[in-house]
């Protein structure tokens, strides 16, 4: 049986992975559970791993994988959310493939996880993604990541990110941002008064700050695919 804090942490990790496609950082876990230090999170993570609910993968940032959920959490709505997502209408442009629960999404090109590069150019390729990875009823597309500025968020060079098309974002969302109408980048979004900060997840890079009118949100990260 899990303690209340262990349940809260597992719930938070699952919710953030459903939303962003990557686990939350230890700082985000600490804030979500209102703990004073990350050592408490380390203890909770270790307890969840020892009980077989999660698995930590070595030598990777934010490398947490959910192995199973307690029955109480399944009854509380995780299974219901899965059923609802599976029954939702297909996103515009998506094509059903033979693999159960999978969809083909257009692979629109490469996106910088580094300094901004030229705006995304679409191509004829597509990528197959789990249907459960798609959030809501909006249009989705995929991009190949170029660069290492988001590695602390678990996003590596060569990964495929799944993006839900939208023009707005909340603080902390990982977004595709179009800068000055011609440069695209994948960064964490922060609003600072009349300015927009695009934050990397790698200390080797600096946060980019632009006037609000120079930044257009093109979509939000909802999933990630990695080939080994």
Swiss-Prot record:
DNA-binding positions: 26-46
GO biological process: DNA repair; DNA replication; negative regulation of DNA-templated transcription; proteolysis; SOS response
Keywords: Autocatalytic cleavage, DNA damage, DNA repair, DNA replication, DNA-binding, Hydrolase, Repressor, SOS response, Transcription, Transcription regulation
GO CC annotation: protein-DNA complex
Catalytic site positions: 149, 187
EC number(s) given by UniProt: 3.4.21.88
EC class (word): hydrolase
Molecular-function GO term, any one: transcription cis-regulatory region binding
Keyword S-adenosyl-L-methionine: no
Catalytic activity of the protein: Hydrolysis of Ala-|-Gly bond in repressor LexA
Superkingdom in the source lineage: Bacteria
Pfam short name (any one): Peptidase_S24
Residues the UniProt record annotates as site (Cleavage): 113-114
Quaternary structure note: Homodimer.
NCBIfam families tied to this protein: lexA
Family according to the record: Belongs to the peptidase S24 family.
Function: Represses a number of genes involved in the response to DNA damage (SOS response), including recA and lexA. Has been shown to bind to the direct repeat sequence 5'-GTT-N(7)-GTTC-3'. In the presence of single-stranded DNA, RecA interacts with LexA causing an autocatalytic cleavage which disrupts the DNA-binding part of LexA, leading to derepression of the SOS regulon and eventually DNA repair.
Protein name: LexA repressor
Source organism: Cereibacter sphaeroides (strain ATCC 17023 / DSM 158 / JCM 6121 / CCUG 31486 / LMG 2827 / NBRC 12203 / NCIMB 8253 / ATH 2.4.1.)
């Amino acid at each position: 049986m899990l303690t209340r804090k262990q349940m809260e942490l597992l719930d938070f990790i699952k919710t953030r992975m459903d939303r962003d496609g990557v686990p939350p950082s230890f700082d985000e876990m600490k804030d979500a559970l209102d703990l004073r230090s990350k050592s408490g999170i380390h203890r909770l993570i270790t307890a969840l791993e020892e009980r077989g609910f999660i698995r930590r993968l070595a030598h990777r940032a934010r490398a947490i994988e959910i192995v199973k959920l307690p029955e109480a959490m399944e009854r509380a709505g995780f299974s219901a959310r899965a059923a609802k997502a599976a029954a939702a209408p297909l996103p515009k442009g998506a094509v059903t493939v033979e693999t159960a629960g999978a969809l083909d999404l257009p692979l629109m090109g490469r996106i910088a996880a580094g300094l901004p590069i030229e705006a995304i150019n679409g191509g004829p390729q597509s990528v197959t993604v789990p249907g459960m990875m798609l959030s809501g009823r909006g249009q989705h597309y995929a991009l190949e990541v170029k660069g290492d500025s988001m590695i602390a968020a678990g996003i590596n060079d060569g990964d495929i990110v799944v993006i839900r098309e939208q023009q707005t974002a909340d603080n902390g969302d990982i977004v595709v941002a179009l800068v000055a109408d011609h440069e695209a980048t994948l960064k964490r979004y922060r609003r600072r008064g009349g300015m927009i900060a695009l934050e990397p997840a790698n200390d080797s890079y600096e946060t980019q700050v632009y006037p609000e009118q120079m930044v257009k949100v093109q979509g939000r990260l909802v999933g990630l695919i990695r080939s080994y």
